[in-house]
Amino acid sequence: MSGLTVSIRGRNGAFAIEAGFAAEGGVTALFGHSGAGKTTLLKMIAGTLRPENGRIAVGDFTLFDAQKGINLPPEKRRIGYVFQDARLFAYMSVKRNLTYARWAGHRPATRSFDEVVALLGIGHLLDRRPSTLSGGERQRVAIGRALLSDPALLLLDEPLSSLDHARRQEILPFIERLRDESHVPIVYVSHEIDEVARLADQIVLLSAGRVTASGAAADIFPLIDAESEGGGVLLEGIVSAYDERYKLAEIDLGGASFQLSDAGLKQTMHVRLRVRARDVSIARKIPEAISIRNLLPVTVTGIERGEGPNAHVFLDFRGRRLGARLTRRSVDDLGLSVGDQVVALVKAVSVDRAAIREK
């Protein structure tokens, strides 16, 4: 088994969908606004909705092939499905919910019960009923049940959408552990940018039933930012130095570097940085006596002016893309044009803590 390959066309009532992408492993996020076709696509992968033509496969395991007449029923696809609501058996204990999944899978176990329980931190919940669990706990149990069915692929359909912010923060580290330790490809449906930034290895953008872009998270994430105040770019790096006196970490981005204050970082840690366009300003030259630590020499690669007061300036920083959201007045006052060499002032950098990995 390996990654997921999808190339299909079909309909869900009057809604038409045409999707093609390949995901090598890790977490593939299906991202788009409500009604973009994310759940419809997930149903076609799961086998509860039949495409009109095309092919779906996990590695060399074919789930659907219209040309060859293959359309495996859902129970034969080796897919674990986690919904927005946990859908646990209310009359069963947590332990029985989990062991039922193993029985229903009808396959030899590749993961032990204890391994899955430890991975998701649910050992203390085994004797309880679903009605006594918090929303985050129920979703962790639902993920455990899906994992114990020995899936070749996990489909998570907005699993955090019914949870408040605190519960989301509670469960995200467990989904990250699942990504890093289970070795099962995951398709993760969401319209929350923060979740995608934190979890995704690959991103598939959907709009009106069509894939508009797909690829590595760092490459696709800037496309989300063009439409949202909350987006930005993702930069992968390694902590190359740490100043104990000032609690400043230096992040090596492959020839370039960032400085940020974070007492939890240590040398050799791999981290994912998120730089939002709203946190980037532009100057014609390096300012004197300024508190901002990250002053980066960049090249203007594009300017997108909206009808409102703002403009988006696309920047290149040693082969890495950045963006700055400025007012149109600022763009005109600076006289910016494509090809200009300017300085990006990065006012804030966030570290996606789940993306921190010690090597």
Curated annotation (Swiss-Prot):
Q: How does it sit in the membrane?
A: Peripheral membrane protein
Q: What is the uppermost EC class here? A: translocase
Q: Boundaries of each Mop domain copy?
A: 289-355
Q: Which residues bind ATP?
A: G32, H33, S34, G35, A36, G37, K38, T39
User: Which reaction(s) does the protein catalyse, per the Swiss-Prot or TrEMBL entry?
Assistant: molybdate(out) + ATP + H2O = molybdate(in) + ADP + phosphate + H(+)
**PROSITE patterns for this protein:** ABC_TRANSPORTER_1 (PS00211), ABC_TRANSPORTER_2 (PS50893), MODC (PS51241), MOP (PS51866)
Assembly? The complex is composed of two ATP-binding proteins (ModC), two transmembrane proteins (ModB) and a solute-binding protein (ModA).
Which protein is depicted?
Molybdenum import ATP-binding protein ModC
Native organism is Brucella abortus (strain 2308)
